[in-house]
């Protein structure tokens, strides 16, 4: 149990996908203008990353490795992610039409989110078992969501703040992201891998 807790804390805080590995920057900067859309995107991405991580482990372990087709790993993972995203889109459309309209084009763009493919490939490269893959996928998504929600909250406050003209828009957003990355560096000694 301690191993899974360390994996969770290490992935969310120490090895955050956005601030440390620089994966998923497009939705991080694109969807984080409003807190509501960041929360919705975070929930959808959490669902997709967890399911894609587990699905990729199953496909790699039971199909690609036994049949010696590991060279098709990236292509097969992209297909798995596309199927999971389509499933997520159908679920969100049925359960929350308002969230579906709010996310708009960003929901299908989860397919091209490099963080989703990154978590699937890292699971395989790190040699995780099924449960570790599920925890790692969920942890990576939780870290992604945490950072995106925090960033959206900060950007909403910056929208009404008196920011100097040269720093308005994407300039202050990138400065804020850099400061968040520095803040998360403080967690570096928390977990040793």
Swiss-Prot record:
One of its GO terms (cellular component) is plasma membrane. Belongs to the NqrDE/RnfAE family. Its main location: membrane. The chain crosses the membrane at residues 5-25, 47-67, 72-92, 102-122, 134-154, 171-191. It comes from Serratia proteamaculans (strain 568). It is a multi-pass membrane protein. Pfam families: Rnf-Nqr (PF02508). One of its GO terms (biological process) is electron transport chain. It is found in: Cell inner membrane. This is Ion-translocating oxidoreductase complex subunit A. Its EC number is 7.-.-.-. Signal peptide: none annotated. The complex is composed of six subunits: RnfA, RnfB, RnfC, RnfD, RnfE and RnfG. It comes from the Bacteria. The keyword Cell membrane applies. Part of a membrane-bound complex that couples electron transfer with translocation of ions across the membrane. The keyword Membrane applies. Keywords: Cell inner membrane, Cell membrane, Electron transport, Membrane, Translocase, Transmembrane, Transmembrane helix, Transport.
């Amino acid at each position: 149990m301690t191993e899974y807790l360390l994996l969770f804390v290490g992935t969310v805080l120490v090895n955050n996908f956005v601030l440390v590995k620089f994966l998923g920057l497009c939705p991080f900067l694109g969807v984080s203008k409003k807190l509501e859309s960041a929360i919705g995107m975070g929930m959808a991405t959490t669902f997709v990353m967890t399911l894609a991580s587990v699905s990729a482990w199953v496909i790699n372990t039971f199909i690609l490795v036994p049949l010696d087709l590991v060279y098709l790993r990236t292509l097969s993972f992209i297909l798995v992610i596309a199927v999971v995203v389509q499933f997520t889109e159908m679920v969100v459309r049925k359960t929350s039409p308002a969230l579906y309209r709010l996310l708009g084009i960003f929901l299908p763009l989860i397919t091209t989110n490099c963080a989703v493919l990154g978590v699937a490939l890292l699971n395989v490269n790190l040699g995780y078992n099924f449960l570790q893959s599920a925890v790692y996928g969920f942890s990576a998504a939780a870290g992604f969501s945490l950072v995106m929600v925090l960033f959206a909250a900060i950007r909403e406050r910056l929208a009404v703040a008196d920011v100097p003209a040269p720093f308005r828009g994407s300039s202050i957003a990138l400065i804020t992201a850099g400061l968040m990355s520095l803040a998360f560096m403080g967690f570096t000694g928390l977990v040793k891998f």
